[in-house]
Amino acid sequence: MSYRLLSVDKDELVTSPCLKERNYLGLSDCSSVDSSTIPNVVGKSNLNFKATELRLGLPESQSPERETDFGLLSPRTPDEKLLFPLLPSKDNGSATTGHKNVVSGNKRGFADTWDEFSGVKGSVRPGGGINMMLSPKVKDVSKSIQEERSHAKGGLNNAPAAKAQVVGWPPIRSYRKNTMASSTSKNTDEVDGKPGLGVLFVKVSMDGAPYLRKVDLRTYTSYQQLSSALEKMFSCFTLGQCGLHGAQGRERMSEIKLKDLLHGSEFVLTYEDKDGDWMLVGDVPWEIFTETCQKLKIMKGSDSIGLAPGAVEKSKNKERV
């Protein structure tokens, strides 16, 4: 069966007594078209499209519609930026705004989800969830900054002394030079008329000997002690040359060796002074010799001819007289 709806004018219903309007389907007075559009209008009126509308702007910036509709957390300075723009405000006394936003279709803020997760009851302070998470970290950061500042101040007060400037080549610091100078001055100081305990090493060489020796002139006080020490140093080499003479030759060599070194019959003891000139040992007093001697050399008597007047010529003159 097919039903046909007839549109009847209301004026005709009033004027004609025969036709009466009857509601067989139990519908309301408003038309079907009007009844279908009413829920949509109500739903659209509840939705806030301006709050979710996309706009061009700087990052984390707020539009005036969002500020008026959602009521921001608290009055803030222009430099502050919201971390969660959709977080509902608790300052207006509306504790159920989060629930209303969920019912109306808006997404919940971070504070609502945090409260539900932690099970915290009652009202929450503005930005309670954020402050709850960030406040311990902020305190730790502030404490660390204060400690660093205190350490920096202490470091400035207790700054180490500046190192001495490096001078000369190879580089030697001035304090090392000072210590070396002080040590040498102490060594040169005289105590009870005796020279200091410093050392004065000089090299000793001998013609025909394949090695060198070093002697400390400060350990000797006369030419006799120096000559006997050199005899012990080079006795093996000189006695080896005289080994053909047997035991008697060795005894004779050891007996006349000192005389040979001093008088130049076979070997002559010479030294090099500060000017680089070679001189015969024994020409000057012992103190001057220790100050000017740079090297010692035991050379053959024939090679010592032409040096400054030495002990050899003086001894020859004495023998003639």
UniProtKB/Swiss-Prot annotation:
Annotated ranges, domain PB1: 199-301
GO cellular component, one term: nucleus
Keyword Repressor appears in the UniProt entry: yes
Subcellular location: Nucleus
SUPFAM superfamilies, per database record: CAD & PB1 domains
PROSITE patterns hit by this protein: PB1 (PS51745)
Sorted UniProt keywords: Auxin signaling pathway, Nucleus, Repressor, Transcription, Transcription regulation
Superkingdom to which the source organism belongs: Eukaryota
Motif stretch (EAR-like (transcriptional repression)): 54-58
Induction field: By auxin.
Regions crossing the membrane: none
Gene Ontology biological process terms from the UniProt entry: auxin-activated signaling pathway; negative regulation of lateral root development; regulation of DNA-templated transcription
Subunit structure: Homodimers and heterodimers. Interacts with TPL.
Domain-related comment: The N-terminal half of the protein contains two conserved domains I and II. Domain I includes a slightly degenerated ERF-associated amphiphilic repression (EAR) motif which seems to be involved in the activity of transcriptional repression. Domain II is required for the correct degradation of the protein through the SCF-mediated ubiquitin-proteasome pathway. Interactions between Aux/IAA proteins and auxin response factors (ARFs) occur through their C-terminal dimerization domains III and IV.
Its job: Aux/IAA proteins are short-lived transcriptional factors that function as repressors of early auxin response genes at low auxin concentrations. Repression is thought to result from the interaction with auxin response factors (ARFs), proteins that bind to the auxin-responsive promoter element (AuxRE). Formation of heterodimers with ARF proteins may alter their ability to modulate early auxin response genes expression.
Family affiliation: Belongs to the Aux/IAA family.
Protein name, UniProt field: Auxin-responsive protein IAA8
Lineage, opening ranks: Eukaryota, Viridiplantae, Streptophyta, Embryophyta, Tracheophyta
